[in-house]
Amino acid sequence: MSIFKTLTCNIGSYYYFLREIISPSLIRDAKEIPIIINNFNRLTTLRLLTETLTACGYTNIYILDNASTYPPLLEYYKTCPFTVFHLNQNLGFKALWKSPLKKRFCNDYYIYTDSDVIPSDYCPKDFIDYFFKELKKHPFARKIGFSLRIDNIPDSYIHKEEVINLETILSQTCRRRSVQSTNRYNLRPLSPSCRIEQKPFSRSLPNSISLPSRTFALV
């Protein structure tokens, strides 16, 4: 990370730390945190993710649809038990921040994830509760989330080696700066005062569920 990015990150962390003191969060329980799922033309993984979340007791789910055109998905939306926000155009992974929904969700704790990121079967069911507690323990951390599981990436995935190399470098770096380790979780900061991430409990590509701290930042 460059000196400029490090400085910017640290300033941002202090800014949101002070905002949290001045205007405390209204969220007291992890199950109250809204989960916004960014989706484009994915049905199978979307349903698997929502089923996994609800099975763990996390039901405050919203789907942000990036102008999907897949007929079976559009049909599913008609009976979907969750609120679906339909965008008029595909705004990509930054859709939440580029849409008016930013004002609704990004002024307190929120979870923003892709629809193809599924917690592994051996992931503890209280993972969001755990993330929430750990984020509270680290007041200068702005977000927290899974890291990728890389032992099951298919050879057909063209970026396999790139992902493995990147995750390996991050793991080696973070082991040297580990902030806490338990028999269930291994927490690791990815950058100074910016992010705490958990070892492989996510079984899908490309990124992981992240819990940004109140009033921003996110993956």
Predicted regions and their residues:
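Acidic donor-binding segment of Leloir-type glycosyltransferases
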Residues: 52-89
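C-terminal catalytic/acceptor-binding lobe
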Residues: 3-18, 167-219
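Short, high-confidence coil segments that cap the C-terminus of an alpha-helix
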Residues: 58, 107, 140-141
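Conserved beta-strand scaffold positions in the cores of enzyme catalytic domains, especially
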Residues: 84-86, 110, 143
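Conserved catalytic core of nucleotide-sugar-dependent glycosyltransferases
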Residues: 93-95, 120-200
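Active-site nucleotide-sugar/metal-binding loop of Leloir-type enzymes
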Residues: 94-109
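Short beta-strand-to-loop acidic/aromatic patch adjacent to the donor-nucleotide binding site
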Residues: 106-122
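N-proximal low-complexity "stem/linker" segments adjacent to membrane-targeting elements
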Residues: 1-51
